[in-house]
A protein has these predicted regions:
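Active-site lining segments that contact anionic ligands and/or coordinate catalytic metals
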Residues: 314-316, 330
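Active-site/pore-lining binding-face segments in mid-to-C-terminal subdomains
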Residues: 316-317, 322
Length: 337
């Protein structure tokens, strides 16, 4: 594979914005077709911000139409584009209106799922590195969050895109969602962020305790991927150091027995079978359904993790078709599925 030369990026940007950037689709999306229910001057009141060469940051950009947007982007050749809210006035005229009159009125609800937040449940990569093994985490997260947004909240218009570097974004674009208050947005985020944990978790996971319906439905999705991902690709029960982290979370009544069985086993899959048998034993004792998938997924935050979710209207998130200049790569986002 040919090595990328960062000094070529400015010329590549010019080529990209002149020949490849999907201006028509971009404008149609952010103008929502200009149909019924879309306020007058909707696109003109949308804020854009550009990051240029040498990290020069320009806010409060706005455009009359697709043609103006196209001309300015080909003139500026931004390294990064952020999309903001739709305001009461044109953002490029925000200094000309009365103090306090310039207010955000609409904004999509956007979730940013970052692979680095899963470093405690992947062993193949870390930081911004991604491979086919750990990308399974993104697949699980997408299916979990998308199911909840669709079935639990009834949101219809959801755009999943690759962030261009180390994760995915979900843009929820329903008209009703774009007008949600900060309090309601925070409530949605809280609902989807029930599980907290990681390597610092000390609380034992009681496999028989009642589980929130969102987590239960998430576990059902995880089951389709768990053994292949956790036991084969990540080999989470490979050695004593690894399995001790798991056993620290199980009830004391089965801890010693599992420790002995784990030492006699030769693979993560074999140790997993012992863990499932222990869960079944707990179920018979307590007469309450148990599921080891639920315990491990909850403890290690496999269900869902989101970062940079702005519950307000004033924040901006990276555009769906951009160059990430600092890593010198094309970040043409594409729909995941």
């Amino acid at each position: 594979m040919e090595t990328f030369d960062p000094t070529e990026l400015p010329e590549l940007l010019k080529l990209y914005y002149r020949r490849l950037f999907p201006y028509a689709q971009y404008y149609r999306w952010l103008n929502y077709g200009g149909g019924d229910g879309v306020i007058k001057n909707y696109f003109q009141h949308r804020e854009f911000s550009f990051t240029l060469k040498d990290d020069i940051y320009i806010r409060y950009q706005s455009f009359n139409n697709q043609s103006d947007l196209e001309k300015e982007m080909q003139k500026m050749n931004p390294y990064k584009i952020d999309i903001g809210a739709v305001y009461s006035h044109r953002p490029n005229q925000h200094n000309t209106v009365k103090l306090g009159a310039f207010q955000a009125q609409e904004k999509e609800l956007v979730f940013d799922i970052d692979m680095t937040d899963y470093d405690d449940v992947r062993r193949c990569c870390s930081s911004a590195d991604i491979c086919s093994k750990c990308w399974t985490l993104m697949t699980m997260a997408i299916r979990i969050i998308d199911r909840a947004l669709k079935e639990d909240f009834g949101f219809k218009h959801r755009l999943w895109v690759y962030s261009g570097r180390r994760g995915v974004h979900c843009w929820v674009c329903d008209e009703s969602v774009r007008k949600l208050s900060s309090a309601v947005r925070s409530g949605i985020v809280e609902y989807l962020s029930l599980v907290k944990g990681g390597q610092d978790v000390k609380k034992k996971v009681h496999l028989s305790e009642r589980i929130h319906p969102f987590i239960r439905r998430s576990i059902n999705i995880i089951k389709n991927y768990f053994e292949k991902y956790a036991l084969v690709d990540q080999d989470i029960l490979e050695n004593k150091e690894s399995w001790d982290k798991i056993l620290a979370l199980v009830p004391e009544t089965v801890h010693d027995e599992l420790q002995q069985n784990f030492q006699k086993s030769h693979s993560s899959l074999q140790r997993w079978e012992h863990l499932k048998k222990a869960a079944s034993k707990c179920q018979k004792t307590s007469n309450v359904p148990t599921d080891p998938h639920a315990g491990l997924a909850s403890a290690f935050r496999i269900t869902s993790k989101m970062t940079n979710v702005d519950p307000g209207w004033s924040g901006r998130l990276c555009s769906s078709t951009v160059f990430h200049g600092w890593i010198s790569m094309l970040a043409k986002e594409s729909i995941i599925y």
